């Protein structure tokens, strides 16, 4: 069902899977009270490492040609679509939400990445504020690493609402 490493769900920091400095905790399904798996429990040191990794990656991501950044976001959307059923099943099991909601939420996650992929080119030009009678000048620049916190009720889809626009704008993300 849900794909995970033999050591449970780990943190991904600087492209590597790492255990949490705070040990781990069991994630329990509200559906049947079964243990789904062990999840890395992060601590302040883990957050600091993730923030430093995001800061180090920021210049490369920020300066990437928009065409390349858009292509990456579209590949993410395609990956979500390819695994939408698995994502929905995991979300049902993890949150207790009904299939009819989670199956749509998984697809919506892909749609969020596609939408923001289409916004990559306009992320810096300010042209969304066009007016026939006024001159609008907007300077948009990526601000750096963005910290994202996701609520528990629809975590996958709500994560995409936050991660996709940040990546499209040229920011890196700690989630």
Predicted regions and their residues:
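A short local loop/turn or secondary-structure capping micro-motif enriched for an aromatic residue
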Residues: 28, 44-47, 156
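Hydrophobic face of amphipathic alpha-helices that form TPR/SEL1-like repeat modules
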Residues: 1-32
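Glycine-rich loop-to-alpha-helix module at the N-terminal edge of alpha/beta enzyme cores
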Residues: 34-123, 133
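Conserved strand-loop elements at the edges of beta-sheets that form or border functional pockets
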Residues: 29, 41, 140
């Amino acid at each position: 069902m849900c794909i995970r490493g033999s050591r449970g769900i780990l943190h991904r920091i600087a492209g590597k899977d790492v255990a949490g400095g705070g040990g781990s905790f069991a994630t329990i399904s509200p559906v049947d009270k079964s243990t789904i798996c062990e999840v890395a429990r992060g601590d302040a040191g883990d957050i600091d490492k993730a923030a430093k990794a995001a800061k180090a990656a920021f210049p490369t991501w920020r300066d990437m040609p928009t065409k390349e950044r858009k292509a990456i976001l579209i590949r993410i959307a395609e990956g979500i679509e390819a695994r939408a059923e698995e994502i929905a099943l995991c979300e049902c099991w993890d949150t207790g939400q009904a299939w009819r909601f989670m199956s749509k939420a998984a697809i919506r996650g892909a749609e969020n990445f596609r939408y923001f992929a289409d916004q990559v080119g306009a992320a810096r030009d300010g042209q969304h504020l066009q007016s026939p009678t006024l001159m609008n000048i907007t300077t948009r620049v990526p601000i750096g690493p963005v910290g994202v916190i996701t609520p528990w009720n629809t975590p996958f889809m709500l994560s995409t609402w936050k991660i996709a626009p940040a990546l499209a704008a040229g920011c890196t993300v700690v989630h």
